[in-house]
C-alpha cells in the first residue's frame, strides 16, 4: 500500500491524557517506518459549554495556548525517545483554536493515518471510546488508529504479528492492504482471520459444517492470493473460524502488535458510518487498532 502524497503524513491528536502519550510514540515509530512526516495537533476550543452566558476572561485563552505549547513540547520529547534505527521523522506541530473533532476530520483529508488515544482528557468512567475517537471513527477521511493507554504486556511486542479481519467487503480489502503493508515494514508475520458467522448458528439443523468450513477457507485463500504475490516477504497464517468476528479479533489481539479491521463489514448498509465489528474491536482490543476508513474525497 502506498503512503501517497498526503502532505501532513501521520497526524496524531494530543491532549493531556495518558493515551495521548502512547499515541504519539506509536505514531512516531510508524512515521519513521514509512519515511513520512508526523504532524502533532492540539485543538483548543475557544468556547466552553455552559448554561451560563459567562464570557471567558483573556487569561483563560492565554493559559490554553500556553498549555497547548507545553503539550507539544512534551510530545516532541516522546518522538525523540521513540526513534528506532532510522532516526525520528520530520515533525510539524499545530495548535488550532477550534473544536477537536471537526478540526481533525478536516485535516484527515491530507493525512495518511489519523492517530488518537481511545479516551481523551475529558474521559468518563466506564466509557471505552471518547468523543474524539468516536467522531473520527465515523467521519475521518483516512484510516484511523485507536491507541489505548497501556503498553503491551507481551515480552517482545515488536516481534508479534499483525492481525487483520477479512470478510470480503471493500473496507476489508483496504484493511488487508494496510495490514500487509504494516507487516512488511515491521518485518513480522500476518495473521488473516475470517470469522464467518455474525450470529450463533451452531444449533441450526441441516448445515454441512465441514463443507462450509472448506468453502470459507477457499474464499480466504483467494482473497489473499494477490497480496501474497505483492508481499512475498510476509509470512501468512490463515485462520477460519465459526464464530463472531469481533469476539475472535478481540481475543486474538492479545497475541498481536496491531489489529486492522474495515470500517464496515459485509453486513454494513449504505450510509453506515462505522460497523459494529470495527467499533467493538476499537473499544475492547488492548493493542493498537487501525480502522480502515476509505477516503471520502
UniProtKB/Swiss-Prot annotation:
Source species, domain of life: Bacteria
Keywords assigned by UniProt, alphabetized: ATP-binding, Nucleotide-binding, Virulence
Consequence of gene disruption: The deletion strain is hypervirulent compared to the wild-type strain in infection studies with outbred Hartley guinea pigs and with C3H/HeJ mice but not with C57BL/6 mice. No phenotype when grown in culture upon disruption, probably due to functional redundancy among paralogs.
GO biological process, one term: regulation of growth
InterPro entries for this protein: Rossmann-like_a/b/a_fold (IPR014729), Universal_stress_UspA (IPR006015), UspA (IPR006016)
Binding residues for ATP 1: 13, 43, 117-123, 127, 131-132
Cysteine pairings via disulfide bonds: none
A GO cellular-component term linked to this record: plasma membrane
Positions contributing to ATP 2 binding: 165, 198, 262-268, 276-278
One annotated GO molecular function: ATP binding
Induction: A member of the dormancy regulon. Induced in response to reduced oxygen tension (hypoxia), low levels of nitric oxide (NO) and carbon monoxide (CO). It is hoped that this regulon will give insight into the latent, or dormant phase of infection. Induced in mouse lungs at the same time that adaptive host immunity induces bacterial growth arrest; induction is dependent on interferon gamma.
Role summary: May play a role in the establishment of a persistent infection (latency) in the host, as strains without this gene are hypervirulent.
Additional observations: Was identified as a high-confidence drug target.
Subunit relationships: Homodimer.
PANTHER family xrefs: STRESS RESPONSE PROTEIN NHAX (PTHR46268), UNIVERSAL STRESS PROTEIN RV2623 (PTHR46268:SF27)
Family designation: Belongs to the universal stress protein A family.
Protein name listed in UniProt: Universal stress protein Rv2623
Organism: Mycobacterium tuberculosis (strain ATCC 25618 / H37Rv)
